[in-house]
A protein has these predicted regions:
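Chalcogenol-based redox active-site neighborhoods
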Residues: 1-170
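Conserved small/polar residues in nucleotide/adenosyl-binding loops
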Residues: 173-175
């Protein structure tokens, strides 16, 4: 995979509003459906990316660990002509296989990804209950082939700080 730098949203930015189809149940999901008292985690993922595949187990664990404290949504913005394994049908299969209890949305036009300035997968955006961006970045410092097991340490630290009313400090990313 080529190294892709992402400009990402600035911290303190309000969550872009969107409506997309949930690949699992074909219903439209809107940001207005989020619980107003709960922080939100928006995850840009896809089915074929080796980095996302590397994180499957940890993503499942993390979302289960925080399901009572966060709202989750995953979005795939890939071109299914070039990546047929990222089609809504395949997204549904993966969501069922991994036990996703949250919406897995298909961004066919890539407009939502552009509004988040998401350039690669996976990318994580953690918003407070007022939909203000508190963290954007990686899950942890593991990657396919580097010998480090996924732990979610960077994202978990950000979530814990947010849930405990502490400042989320990006300088504390684990290298």
């Amino acid at each position: 995979m080529a190294l892709t730098y992402s400009s990402m949203l600035e911290l303190g930015t309000q969550m872009p509003e969107f409506e997309l189809e949930n690949a699992v149940n074909n219903e439209i999901f809107s940001t207005s459906y989020f619980n107003s008292t709960t922080p939100k985690l928006v995850m840009f993922i896809c089915n074929h990316c080796p980095y996302v595949i590397h994180y499957h187990k940890e993503l499942t664990k993390l979302t289960q660990d925080y399901k009572d404290h966060l709202d989750f949504v995953a979005i795939s913005s890939n071109d299914i002509v070039n990546y047929p394994e990222d089609s809504p049908e395949k997204m549904k299969e993966l969501a069922i296989e991994l036990g996703f209890f949250f919406p897995y949305l298909y961004d066919e036009t890539q407009d939502v990804a552009k509004s988040f300035k998401a350039a690669c997968t996976p990318e994580f955006y953690l918003f407070n209950n007022e939909k203000t961006l508190e963290y954007r970045g990686r899950l942890d410092n593991s990657s396919p082939g580097n010998g480090i097991e996924p732990s979610g340490i960077d994202l978990r630290d950000a979530i814990e700080k947010l849930l405990n009313g502490k400042e989320v400090n990006l300088s504390l990313i684990h290298i």
